[in-house]
């Protein structure tokens, strides 16, 4: 009897776990995986990866106040517990400066919303093999629609052929690395477009 009860409990737990992965009971949701970035992404106001690592004490105040769950502590040995950015759960909204307001050490310096809009912490990179245009044969354009700076544009896959599907092209000079494109890309498990960080932040 105890065995049957245990089996019943385990079965219920399995069902509940599966329900959490289903969107409204219609489709299974596959969680996004973190892309392999050559350079980590650090928040606007941190100036550079080296500055962030040199001044951060790992207090996690910035992680705690980030409303979009973009910041998380690094698990790398050389930068252990130093927050870095990733866009599986959200993206860095241009109007948010919360992390720069709470940093007590200067790892992330105070920055205004106006200044933040011109700071390039990284740039978007499109991976053709992951894009639904190529994997599923459907048009999307989610990345272009949600880019706050207009850095992502849709162009015909075959130049001169108006009937060919459209694919994204990134204007690196306008991209600020906010991650809206990466976060809202429907491709799974890896986004078809992701942000590569900059060692030193730039101005656009």
Where are these regions (language model features)?
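Non-ligating segments of multi-cofactor redox enzymes
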Residues: 1-204
């Amino acid at each position: 009897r105890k065995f049957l009860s245990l089996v019943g409990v385990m079965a219920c737990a399995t069902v509940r776990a599966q329900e959490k992965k289903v969107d409204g009971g219609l489709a299974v949701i596959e969680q996004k995986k973190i892309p392999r970035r050559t350079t980590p992404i650090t928040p606007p106001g941190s100036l550079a990866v080296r500055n962030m690592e040199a001044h951060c004490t790992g207090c996690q105040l910035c992680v705690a106040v980030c409303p979009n769950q973009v910041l998380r502590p690094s698990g790398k040995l050389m930068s252990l517990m130093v927050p870095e950015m990733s866009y599986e759960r959200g993206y860095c909204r241009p109007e948010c400066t919360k992390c720069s307001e709470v940093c007590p050490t200067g790892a992330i310096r105070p920055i205004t919303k106006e200044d933040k809009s011109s700071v390039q912490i990284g740039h978007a990179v499109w991976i053709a093999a992951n894009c639904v245009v190529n994997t599923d044969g459907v048009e999307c354009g989610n990345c272009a629609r949600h880019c706050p700076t207009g850095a992502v544009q849709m162009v015909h896959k075959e130049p001169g052929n108006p009937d060919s599907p459209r694919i994204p092209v990134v204007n690196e000079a306008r991209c600020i690395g906010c991650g809206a494109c990466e976060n809202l890309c429907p491709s799974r498990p890896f986004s078809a477009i992701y942000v590569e960080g900059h060692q030193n932040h730039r101005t656009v």
